Amino acid sequence: MFKTKEALIPYLLLAAALAGGLLWHESEMVPGLGRTVTSGQIAVGGPYALTDQDGRPRASSDFHGKYQLVYFGYTFCPDVCPTTLAVMAAALDKMGVDQNRIVPVFITIDPERDSPAVLKKYLAAFGPRFVGLTGAPQQIAQVEKEFRVYAKKQPMAGGNYGMDHSSVMYLMGPDGKLVGFYDEAIQPEDLAKDLKKKI
């Protein structure tokens, strides 16, 4: 992952939208995030139809009725993506039976390389609960837009490339609407505690 000013855009958009109509809970400070979204509406997320790591079609409607913890990244990511997925997995492990109310979802920002088979092998390291999603580049671009995700290909030596991208975990409610969001700096125990409050 590359850190650029553009990668901060989703945070700024979310903060602006929050300031425009959401309620902040000053008393609920979460390390790695600060204030967390506790009520109100924000236009994040939307309908999509992608393919999971087993090659099966998956639509956003498949997850209705359950909470989702959604993260956008890519399997060739050298640092923040595996670290964040590990935090998600550890947080869910700390939630006991409540973890069954949340589906952890990893959506690739690199559909050219992240085939279903690649996603399946990659996500196996984080446990069986994860749903990995990929699709055609235009499908992924649309989902990125819906979730206000920044992702841009960055050329590297030897013809390879990395991805500069925002790093946000989105907690989506059973109705598919945003409940809260977290950055990669949050610790598993803090994430687990806040998730338990919100679900």
Protein language model features and the residues they cover:
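Short, small/polar residue-rich loop motifs at catalytic or cofactor-binding pockets
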Residues: 43-45, 67, 164-166
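A short beta-strand-turn-helix
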Residues: 48-68, 92-95
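Thiol/disulfide oxidoreductase modules built on the thioredoxin-like
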Residues: 139-194
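Short, hydrophobic alpha-helical segments
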Residues: 195-199
